[in-house]
């Protein structure tokens, strides 16, 4: 049971300490909380998962240490609303304190990547921005679903933020965190979305040039405010129109994403890449190919970095590389030199052979 700020339990929360991991050994998801208090109009999570329940900082730190001791170099922090971590249990350190605790865990083990996912924009503070900017093991990456950019849609969706406030937040993030990679998601075809609303969203995406963005067509959910709106023919967006809007937005974002990686290749950007897996079937004679990820790429949702190497590499190895080409969403790199190599953790290679 997780205790609330008033000392009363707010729900049962299974510990993840001994769970069976489905991810590769060198990276893992680390759940900081369960449930959500935001109650967006389109979402059923509060009714299914319940109110937000944060793990204690001690529990999150202990699990992080266990995962890193088992070979994980990258920890991806998840929860339905990571921004609000600690609020329900009265931990005034909040998300900055959580990130600082996880950074200490990584630094004590020689380094690592702490990546923040599922942040909620309306409560994202300057202290949270500063934590990402200054903590050495916290990756300069932020996954923050924005859902829309039209004020009327943000109101209908009950997102508790305006378009201008969103722009101000993104400007502060970009200013304080050089090289920040921003991932977001949007919903199109939500009941009440007009062509004007959609055009405002397209203009917002053109303006902000997100490194990564996804788009989903609205999905009807009974029992939600959006679901009730969707029953009104005047508000309902036809499925074919929602599909058109999804395609248009993703084509725009595709162009932006291609340009981001092409620019890195053109300037021969030097960057650290975490090796994920070999792709020997595609390798040329005398060359080894691997998929990996740089700071701007979260596992399973973002693009990959293709590593072309004359030597064998190991999953979990952190390699200093130079960008040499791009292939649509993916960056193509070569290892910088032998002295630029480092393994993710002591004995990491031996552990991965088990």
Where are these regions (language model features)?
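Flexible glycine/acidic-rich beta-alpha junction loops that bind and position SAM and/or redox cofactors
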Residues: 79-89, 123-125, 146-157, 188-195, ...
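Conserved SAM/AdoMet-binding glycine-rich loop
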Residues: 69-198, 206
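Proteins enriched for Cys/Gly/acidic motifs involved in redox and nucleic-acid/cofactor modification
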Residues: 1-85, 127, 142, 164-175, ...
């Amino acid at each position: 049971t997780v205790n609330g700020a008033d000392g009363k339990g707010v729900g049962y929360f299974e510990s993840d300490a001994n769970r069976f991991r489905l991810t590769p050994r060198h990276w893992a998801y680390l759940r900081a909380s369960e449930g959500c208090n935001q109650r967006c109009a389109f979402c059923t999570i509060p009714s299914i998962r319940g109110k937000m329940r944060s793990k204690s900082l001690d529990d999150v730190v202990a699990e992080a240490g266990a995962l890193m001791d088992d070979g994980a170099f990258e920890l991806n922090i998840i929860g339905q609303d990571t921004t609000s971590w600690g609020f329900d249990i009265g931990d005034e350190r909040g998300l900055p304190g959580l990130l600082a605790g996880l950074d200490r865990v990584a630094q004590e083990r020689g380094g690592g990547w702490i990546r923040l996912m599922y942040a909620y924009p309306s409560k994202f503070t300057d202290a949270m921005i500063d934590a990402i900017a200054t903590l050495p093991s916290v990756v300069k990456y932020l996954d923050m679903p924005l859902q829309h950019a039209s004020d009327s849609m943000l109101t209908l969706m009950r997102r508790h933020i305006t378009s201008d406030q969103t722009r101000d937040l993104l400007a502060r993030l970009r200013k304080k965190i050089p090289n920040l990679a921003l991932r977001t998601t949007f919903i199109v075809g939500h009941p009440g979305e007009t062509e004007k609303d959609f055009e405002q969203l397209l203009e917002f995406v053109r303006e902000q040039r997100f490194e990564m963005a996804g788009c989903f067509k609205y999905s009807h959910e009974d029992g939600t405010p959006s679901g009730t709106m969707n029953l009104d023919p005047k508000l309902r967006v036809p499925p074919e129109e929602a599909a058109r809007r999804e395609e248009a937005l993703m084509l725009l974002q595709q162009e932006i994403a291609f340009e981001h990686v092409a620019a890195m290749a053109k300037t021969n950007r030097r960057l650290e890449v975490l090796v994920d897996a070999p792709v020997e079937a595609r390798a040329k004679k005398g060359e080894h190919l691997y998929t990996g990820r740089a700071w701007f790429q979260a596992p399973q949702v973002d693009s990959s970095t293709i590593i072309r190497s004359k030597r064998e590499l190991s999953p979990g190895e952190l390699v200093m590389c130079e960008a040499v080409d791009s292939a649509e969403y993916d960056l193509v790199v070569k290892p910088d030199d032998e002295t630029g190599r480092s393994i993710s953790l002591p004995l990491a290679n031996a552990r991965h052979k088990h």
